[in-house]
Amino acid sequence: MNFKNIIKQKKQLVIAEIGQSHDGSLNYVHSFIDEAAKSGTDIVKFQAHFADEESTYQDQFRTFTTYKKETRFEYWKRMQFTNEEWFKISTHIKQRKMLFSSSVFSKKSINVLNKIGIDVWKIASGESLDLNLIKEITNISKKPLLISTGMNNQQEVDKIYNFMKSKKNLFILMHCVSQYPSNIKNIGINILSEYLKKYDCLIGFSDHSGTLEVPTIALENKISALEIHVVFDKKLYNPDTTSSITFSDLAYLCNFIKLKNKLYKHSISKNK
């Protein structure tokens, strides 16, 4: 599997965002990977958190996240994996003919994932203006980056774009809304066409609506990537559930792209 080849062949790649839906269970992680493969997704994405790098023992949750009696630090500690576990996650994804991606939030997470062979880097909206963090990646890796812009105004997006154009890494600028779930009135699907006109790079959409309709409509634009949170069941409690779709919905989106490509590939003439 090759990132550039996928885009050339499929035009629009699908990124299954697992996020924290595994709830710290390595067994769940591998179940998610297998289900993503069955759905036909191209990239499986996680979040590489390290509590010591991102939080303190006194750090409390600002919004309700878990029913467990734990601090934010303890939560991130429970969510993190060892280097060996990350290697097994990456290996499993590649064995299932998909690419491995993860959001990074610290220099440590960058170094760990670089050593195990990450395929696609992800910069979350909250880190998109941390150019030093992005520079840590571009200094040691030529792998592509997905950069979300859910917390940025237009001037800030311009700054990110200009910075990335000075680097050799392929990158996709991702429109998204940092609201979970995103209200339909706030999604701003018009931003996709504005990005496509304004920026000389690949454009994508990171969806947090928790619906099937919004990503389907987004795919009607000439975007190169769709990132979407997935869960096994919308009835199970998880911080990401309201912003996620199910794997059956994910399979629908993957099949929708395949069918759309076939339709546009086989044109007919009324002149015969």
Regions found by a protein language model. Give the residues of each.
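Catalytic cores and adjacent flexible loops of soluble metabolic enzymes
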Residues: 1-272
